[in-house]
A protein has these predicted regions:
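Adenine nucleotide-associated cytosolic modules
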Residues: 1-158
Length: 158
């Protein structure tokens, strides 16, 4: 960094001081506009299924700056998961996929509230989904996806 350039630290709402986060926010506003960034920042997202696609989706949404992210998966990490699961350390084989992915996902953007749910999506009642604005389901059977889709459509959840 050039010597003549000063960087001022700005205190953010969450108490973090990090110019990079502010720079990222300004970039995102320029990228898709203030209204879209406000909607993203307010979004409560559920991603069910923490394999390759689920990992990529959660990473991108957390980096974009959603309000909160819940990752749900009832299965445990396998050696095969280590190939596509960049969020879960390889020494977490045998641990729940959602819980194994939690720490690295939180590190991607400390301003996003990230939680892990080790339950089975198939056991969730309709009221559970009402806690979210966006629900994304990956790696589940078609009948489960259709059931979740029906619940989300009935409750105006994206």
């Amino acid at each position: 960094m050039p010597k003549n350039r000063q960087i001022r630290s700005i205190k953010l709402k969450e108490g973090k001081t990090n110019l990079t986060r502010i720079s990222d926010l300004f970039f995102q506003i320029r990228l898709w506009g203030l209204d879209a960034q406000k909607r993203l920042r307010a979004a409560r997202v559920l991603v069910a299924g923490m394999r390759g696609l689920g990992n990529e989706v959660t990473k991108n949404l957390v980096l974009a700056g959603v309000n909160s992210m819940t990752i749900l998966d009832h299965e445990n990490m396998t050696k095969e998961d280590c190939v596509s699961s960049f969020l879960a350390p390889t020494d977490h084989v045998g641990k729940n996929r959602a819980q194994a992915s939690l720490e690295r996902l939180k590190q991607r953007n400390p301003m996003v509230e990230v939680t892990a749910d080790p339950d089975n999506l198939e056991t969730k009642e309709e009221g559970f989904f009402k806690n979210f604005d966006v629900v994304i389901v990956t790696n589940y059977p078609k009948d489960v996806c259709l059931k979740v889709n029906k619940i989300c459509r009935a409750n105006n959840i994206k």
